[in-house]
Structure formats: C-alpha cells, structure tokens
Amino acid sequence: MIETQKLLACVVLVTCGNVEEAETIAKTIVTERLAACVNVVGRSEGMQSIFIWDNLLQKESEILLLIKTMPEHLPQLENRIQELHSYSVPEFIVLPVILGGQSYMQWIKDSVSQG
C-alpha cells in the first residue's frame, strides 16, 4: 500500500446516474475546496457501466467524475460524496498520483488548501 503522505495528489473516480447530479456534486466539492478540479466525463452520451446488483446483471448509462484532490482531504471528500449522492453505494475509488507537473501539483495543493 502506498503511504498517503508520499503522494503528490489523488484522482478520485465517482460515477453518477445523470448529468445534473454529477454537476451538483462537482460544483459543491470544488466550492467547498475538497477538490481542485472535477472533470465531468460523458455529459452528452454518458458511458455504459455493466455490473451485478442484487444478483442481476445491470447495464446503466452513467457519468464519470474525475476528482483531483490531496490525500488529506479524502476522508472528508468521501463523507461529502456519501451525503450528496443518490446511490446507496456510490463509487469512490482513489488513484494515487505519484508523478505530475510541478506547477499543476502545486495548483491542486493550493486550491484545496484555501478552504
């Protein structure tokens, strides 16, 4: 496991059932300085997610959020996603950023530190 204090930043993956929910979550967490930036992917056509839920194969159109943040904000970010999200079990997958442009990494840090 990677130690979070050694990470430059994190990218968090969250899927949403529609554009409105995705944009509401994105705007809220950026405004609250829990994220520096959120990319809303699949706005026009969505993306297809295939998974098993309640023992049935599901195929749903979803919107993907790519959330850029710092490791120290992950617990609060996860709690906020839980509060805002309509899914009973929202996706919350953290990808470590171990290398990135120095000025961009600093921008992420500065953006979430101002809150």
Protein language model regions, located:
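Positively charged, small/polar-rich N-terminal and surface patches that mediate targeting and assembly
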Residues: 1-115
